[in-house]
A protein has these predicted regions:
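Bacterial Sec-dependent N-terminal signal peptides
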Residues: 1-31
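Mature catalytic domains of secreted/periplasmic carbohydrate-active enzymes
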Residues: 28-377
Length: 377
């Protein structure tokens, strides 16, 4: 287990700020873009997009408080776990088995060129250092900034790192929109609305947006070498698009990190850099919404990444990305992963293959076995 780094002194914090500023001003290359230097000097985002198209294969990681329950990442909503009860899972969050260096080495051994990890999932728990909420890994028994550790490990080994961020769902934040606003998964269906939920009218949502933008500033300045931001869930956006200032959000990201790529599944407004559907998904996702149809038409010829998971969809066990103990003994084997890779290569898209770490953050033994023996042809 890695020990928590000592609290930064004011002088060291100032030095870190200078490094961040220097990164932006000098246009320092992230390690994973070293082979794209010439293009980067002319257009950082174009260089990053070319790298992404060449990368072909990445690792997806769903890890958070929900991992402790072993029932998938939507367990709070599906089991309508009370807010206070779910929040107490933080008291047992140690991440004692989370080893960023091991994860990066495993990804490299499997032939993966990048990692995408849940910095904040729908439950609102953050795996990074943030001043915006105490509902985070640094303020848990783990006392660790897991995103910082993984960013450092990826930079050291030349892998790209995308940060998954749940923009269109947050079951913890008081000002996210309510069930009455039009989406059945906006909040768990509690019989009595929690007092912590404050949203009453569309104007209230701006308080949540300000929170998101503040956290994006943290992510893009604390980890300036990340490859981009991977937003989710798109249906939460399609159901209520008018409350999301999506252009403002994208402008913020591109101002703070000129090379950063942006994805939001099939697309929110068509200004995304690549499409990122699930399991070969297409425009059928959200096709009942006109905004979805417009975004799809604008994005359909852009690079595409399809995510799939090492945990198969088993009858009665759910369709999960976070750890589900019901899937033990059924994770994908080498031949099954090769089929997914072959399909991706044949159809010209990237494969983002998910693992759901165990409650302590360690990689599932079945996934270690498969990825360690996966030989790309």
């Amino acid at each position: 287990m890695k020990k928590m780094k000592k609290k930064l002194s004011p002088i060291l914090s100032l030095f870190s700020l200078f490094l961040i500023i220097g990164f932006s001003v000098k246009g320092q290359l992230p390690a994973y873009l070293q082979d794209y230097k010439e293009c980067y000097n002319e257009n950082p985002r174009a260089a990053n997009l070319q790298w992404f198209k060449d990368a072909r294969f990445g690792m997806f990681i769903h890890y958070g408080l929900y991992s402790q329950l072993g029932k998938g990442e939507w367990v709070q909503l599906r089991d309508t776990i009370p807010l206070d009860k779910y929040a107490k899972l933080k008291d047992n969050f140690t991440a004692s088995g989370f080893d960023a260096d091991f994860i990066v080495q495993l990804a490299k051994k499997a032939g993966m060129k990048y990692i995408t990890i849940t910095s904040k999932h729908h439950d609102g728990f953050c795996l990074f250092q943030t001043k915006e909420t105490d509902f985070n890994s640094v303020n848990s028994p783990a006392r660790r900034d897991l995103m910082g550790e993984l960013a450092e490990a990826c930079e050291k080994e030349g892998l790209g790192l995308f940060l998954y961020y749940s923009y269109a769902a947050d079951w913890k934040h008081p000002w996210f929109y309510s069930l009455e606003a039009g989406w059945r998964n906006a909040r768990p269906a509690y019989k009595v609305k929690p007092e912590a939920y404050k949203y009453k009218k569309p104007e209230d949502f701006r308080k949540y947006v300000d929170y998101v933008h503040a956290q994006l500033r943290e992510l893009l300045t604390q980890y300036p070498t990340i490859a981009g931001i991977w937003f989710d869930p798109i249906i939460g956006y399609y159901a209520n698009p008018d409350v999301f200032p999506i252009e403002e959000t994208y402008t913020l990201i591109r101002r703070l990190s000129p090379h950063a790529l942006i994805s939001f599944k099939q697309g929110a407004n068509g200004d995304e850099d690549f499409m990122a559907p699930e399991r070969g998904g297409n425009k059928k996702v959200g096709e009942q919404y006109p905004v979805a149809q417009r975004a799809y038409e604008l994005n359909k010829n852009k690079p595409k990444e399809v995510c799939n998971t090492m945990q198969p969809h088993l009858p009665g066990a759910g369709n999960n990305w976070g750890y589900n103990k019901a899937h033990n003994g059924h994770h994908l084997k080498v031949d099954e992963v090769k089929i997914l890779l072959g399909d991706a290569l044949l159809n010209g898209y990237n494969l983002l293959l998910n693992i759901g770490p165990l409650p302590d953050g360690s990689v599932h033994p079945e996934d270690i076995e498969t990825l360690s023996n996966l030989k790309q042809e």
